[in-house]
């Protein structure tokens, strides 16, 4: 759930 260039899933 990162709001950066690359959105990562919240694990």
From Swiss-Prot:
GO terms for biological process: neuropeptide signaling pathway. This is Periviscerokinin-3. The modification Valine amide is found at residue 11. Belongs to the periviscerokinin family. Mediates visceral muscle contractile activity (myotropic activity). It is found in: Secreted. The keyword Membrane does not apply. Keywords: Amidation, Neuropeptide, Secreted. One of its GO terms (cellular component) is extracellular region. InterPro entries: Periviscerokinin.
